[in-house]
Amino acid sequence: MANTLEQLKPFTTIVADTGDIEAIKRYQPEDATTNPSLILKASEIPEYSALIENAIDWAKSQSDDLAQQVEDAGDKLAVNIGLEILKIVPGRISTEVDARLSFDKEASITKAHKLINLYQAAGIDKSRILIKLASTWEGICAAKQLEQEGINCNLTLLFSFAQARACAEAGAYLISPFVGRILDWYKKDTGLEFSATEDPGVVSVTSIYNYYKRHGFNTVVMGASFRNTGEIIELAGCDRLTIGPALLEELQNSTTPIVQKLLPATEVVAPEAEMTEAQFRWEFNEDAMAVEKLAEGIRNFAIDQGKLEVMLKNKLSS
């Protein structure tokens, strides 16, 4: 019998949630995703030292101002790691906009353009890039404009139906609803354990997937942030799943049979009128879990971006 990972691939596009090139080679995903935390982790791998040095040299050539050099080096390093990953995956790389811009539409758009330009300068077409943005109202509005320019976006840190609906209405190419972090919140809040079928993160992604398919939205649903393989198996049939190396290995070493759980809609009906900003903010605010986890996620990505910049600043100053 084929291993569980291979059984999953006919139903769902597998994406590697890592910046570790060796892990990507091992599991042969279609796409890969990175974020500030993964870039920070990848920067500590000795084999990546040349990518860091290249980013440092490039930043020095762009400006004499240290603060600008640090920002430029961070952007170039994220793109350098993306370029290495694109040598392996046949599909796309997701590269994230600085989380500290999550509430600034215009700055997010400017940063997205910069990242795309860096990829294009290295010979990579924008069709192979997804720009990751937090699913704040401002991030969703930035994605709407970028999509109209032909720059595809991955809306991340998505924890609620309100966020998912707004992303689809904005024409986002892809969303990344976070399964495991939803589970974490409910376990802490209730003190209960949940089976894979009752897992609140699984239930959330299933609901979003069914809503999108029933209303004919083309936005891709890519489940993310998994805590165990049970969650992954319950979402077989989801458009895409982005999975970290440890769980990819577990799936590869398993022969648990896969049954497609998420299925296309049998009929498509017209969606409701688009949400206003006020509706979005109210509905999102009604979901305490989503409010807490989005804020926490932005803070944590910003912390790791800061740590990365300290490392780069030290190198730039030496």
Swiss-Prot record:
It catalyses: D-sedoheptulose 7-phosphate + D-glyceraldehyde 3-phosphate = D-erythrose 4-phosphate + beta-D-fructose 6-phosphate. GO terms for biological process: carbohydrate metabolic process; pentose-phosphate shunt. Its EC number is 2.2.1.2. SUPFAM superfamilies: Aldolase. Gene3D superfamilies: Aldolase class I. One of its GO terms (cellular component) is cytosol. It is an enzyme of class 2 (transferase). GO terms for molecular function: transaldolase activity. Transaldolase is important for the balance of metabolites in the pentose-phosphate pathway. This is Transaldolase. It comes from Shewanella halifaxensis (strain HAW-EB4). The lineage of its organism: Bacteria, Pseudomonadati, Pseudomonadota, Gammaproteobacteria, Alteromonadales. The gene is tal.
